[in-house]
Amino acid sequence: AFVVFSTGQKGPSGGASNWGPGFLPSEHQGVMFRSVGDPVLYLSNPKGVDEQIQRDSLHAIKRLNQKHLDVVGDPEIAARINAYELAQRMQLAAPEVMDLSKENEATLKDYGCQPGDGSFASNCLLARRLVEQGVRYVQLFDWGWDFHGTGPGEDIRDGLTNRCKKMDP
């Protein structure tokens, strides 16, 4: 799996192409995690859909996609099947891995973060936890290192000083 976090007022220049698969099959693209709330949209089941209904639905979708793959042979269909399976695994594992409230105080202090603050520091800690759980690649974007003096506190002297304080409290 390939997971992406982004913090700051804007996303990275280049948008989703930064974690897209490029010339590789789409199974190699990254999954953007949000810094606040459910890490992935629709991670939680909607009201009225329990785990069994979801499992049955995903199993039916997989069977249909597999039949289509057998007929057409398009590798994008195989990538779609893998994406659904990854989504289901994330839905089961992500809530626990992404919950920093159970992290000990010393670790939170070392990283300079608080559960739910959506900071770059929290994303670094989440990245570590994901890697510990077997995620092979985590990409972190942090907007706010561009100091061209375009606004208050955005010149190199003040902007860089303030930014470094956030990185190394």
Regions found by a protein language model. Name each.
Residues 1-169:
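Ligand-binding pockets and gating/stacking loops
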